[in-house]
From Swiss-Prot:
Key enzyme in the regulation of glycerol uptake and metabolism. Catalyzes the phosphorylation of glycerol to yield sn-glycerol 3-phosphate. Keywords: ATP-binding, Glycerol metabolism, Kinase, Nucleotide-binding, Phosphoprotein, Transferase. GO terms for biological process: glycerol catabolic process; glycerol metabolic process; glycerol-3-phosphate metabolic process. Homotetramer and homodimer (in equilibrium). Its EC number is 2.7.1.30. PANTHER family: GLYCEROL KINASE, SUGAR KINASE. Pathway: Polyol metabolism; glycerol degradation via glycerol kinase pathway; sn-glycerol 3-phosphate from glycerol: step 1/1. GO terms for cellular component: cytosol. This is Glycerol kinase. Glycerol binds at residues 84-85, 136, 246-247. ADP binds at residues 14, 18, 268, 311, 412, 416. The phosphoenolpyruvate-dependent sugar phosphotransferase system (PTS), including enzyme I, and histidine-containing protein (HPr) are required for the phosphorylation, which leads to the activation of the enzyme.
């Protein structure tokens, strides 16, 4: 094989780790994937073993090399993208985590989030971080670990512990402890970072009593953070030079560089992000304001709507209810359903995300009759994903006073043609599916490649763009609104059921 150069992207997700090697055309040369254990210590809690995540990353790096025959010295740079908010605290000396990683989905810190709300901090946190106070973000997770591991607070104050989201943990491991860094997009999801002033917020750190010594340095999304320790990369000292949280990486991978462009990634959850340009814009309707990416000395902001359960609702049909053998089968069943659409599934298994932010809500089903079939139930579950996306797109249009013309989509569930057509119908706009669904990994690769000159600039990246399939709306207006009205009723009833008893 010639000494062609490549970029490797490490995509560390919620249920698996992947390594993908890309060539100059942005094409996938090889990939490797490994699932790891989901730990559920109590109802609503979700944890990961951070060492197992690291082992899975080492495994997929090897797998990507083996599959392609590419050698480590042919990798020009590494880009990292990761499940956001998931929190690791580890011992600086030994490199060992002091507790499991608390995952973004986990609700174990919900009481702490409620406490902060009741103390009147909602507005302050929103103005500084762009976020809603919720157990979803890293801040309460860090506080929980420092509270529940004996001696942790004292050790943190002495500078013996380090905190990081998964990007930080992986860079620290790959560089053998030489770099303790994060990037704008991941820092913006901690609820500890002031996205206006671009620094860790001293006042919030004080409120939560989190020592500054444990925090990583915040850097741009495209620069060299460090090099791989040779023994972690088969003898290669390769620059790690691009980093972004998974949803922001997908925004970049979808080449959504212009303000007003919107993408949705249908993964475990579903995340809709709109590029709002260089002006920070706070949502008045419960969307998150976050950092899209920072590159070439400029920071681009974004509005985001987070849906906690999307693809994982299909996994639930497969693993929990055993209604389907595999995820793609859900499309076949949905097409076989009676065409009445009167069943509504509200998959609030871990609460409701944007724009409701109800952490007490739980999953519910409405409209069942004696005639309801398995096919109807599966279809309603798929439709629930599309309804939740509409909740957010409608809110975004109100917040920005922008009419969204097209939604760029990617992620595993975007392969479901039934879901994509229903999404176009219920939104009444075109859905443009990326030809290369690896947009998250591709975004990380683009960020890494730009900083080492593998790709010259954003204009060169735009030339690599190939659109996949376009789904156009075909449902009439009154039917569309009637269906959506039913969904709103179902969500309202779900929230009533979740009300805390006196």
């Amino acid at each position: 094989m010639s000494q062609e150069k490549y970029i490797m992207a490490i995509d560390q997700g919620t249920t698996s780790s992947r390594a993908i090697i890309f060539n100059k055309k942005g094409e996938k040369v090889s990939s490797s994937q490994k699932e790891f254990t989901q730990i559920f210590p109590q109802a609503g809690w979700v944890e990961h073993n951070a060492n197992e995540i690291w082992n899975s990353v080492q495994s997929v790096i090897a797998g990507a090399f083996i599959e392609s025959g590419v050698k480590p010295n042919q990798i020009e740079a590494i880009g990292i993208t990761n499940q956001r908010e998931t929190t690791v605290v580890w011992d600086k000396k030994t490199g060992l985590p002091i507790y499991n990683a608390i995952v973004w989905q986990s609700r174990q810190t919900a009481p702490l989030a409620e406490q902060l709300k009741s103390q009147g901090y909602v507005e302050k946190f929103h103005e500084k971080t762009g976020l809603i106070i919720d157990a979803y973000f890293s801040a309460t997770k860090v506080r929980w670990i420092l509270d529940h591991v004996e001696g942790a607070q004292e050790r943190a104050e002495k500078g013996e512990l380090l905190f990081g989201t998964i990007d930080t943990w992986l860079v620290w491991k790959l560089t053998d402890g030489a770099a303790h860094v994060t990037d704008y997009s991941n820092a913006a999801r901690t609820m500890l970072y002031n996205i206006k002033e671009l620094k860790w917020d001293d006042e919030i750190l004080e409120i939560l009593n989190i020592p500054k010594a444990i925090l990583p340095e915040v850097r741009s999304n495209s620069e060299i953070y460090g090099k791989t320790a040779p023994f972690h990369f088969y003898g290669g000292e390769v620059p790690i030079s691009g980093m972004a949280g998974d949803q922001q990486a997908a925004l970049f991978g979808q080449l959504a560089f212009e303000p007003g462009m919107v993408k949705n990634t249908y993964g475990t959850g579903s995340f809709i992000i709109m590029n709002t340009g260089e002006e920070m814009q706070l949502s008045e309707n419960n969307l998150l304001t976050t950092i899209g990416y920072g590159i070439n000395g400029k920071v681009y902001y974004a509005l985001e709507g987070s849906i906690f359960i999307a693809g994982s609702a299909i996994q639930w049909l497969r693993d929990g209810l055993r209604m389907v053998e595999n995820s793609p089968e859900s499309e076949k069943y949905a097409r076989d359903s009676h065409n009445n659409d009167e069943v509504y599934v509200v998959p609030a298994f871990t609460g409701l995300g944007a724009p409701y932010w109800n952490q007490n809500a739980r999953g519910s089903v409405f409209g069942l009759t004696r005639g309801t079939s398995k096919e109807d139930f599966i279809k309603a579950t798929l439709q629930s994903i599309a309804y939740q996306v509409r909740d957010i797109i409608d809110t975004m249009q109100v917040d920005t006073q922008t009419a969204i013309q097209v939604l760029k989509v990617d992620g595993g569930a975007a392969m479901n043609n039934f879901l994509m057509q229903f999404q176009a119908d219920i939104l009444g706009i075109d859905i443009a599916r990326a030809k290369n669904l690896e947009t998250t990994a591709l975004g990380a690769a683009f960020l890494a490649g730009l900083s080492v000159g593998y790709w010259k600039d954003l204009d060169e990246l735009k030339l690599l763009n190939e659109t996949g399939e376009l789904f156009e709306p075909s449902m009439n207006e009154s039917r569309k609104e009637q269906l959506y009205k039913g969904w709103k009723k179902a969500v309202k009833a779900t929230q009533v059921f979740a009300e805390v008893d006196d």
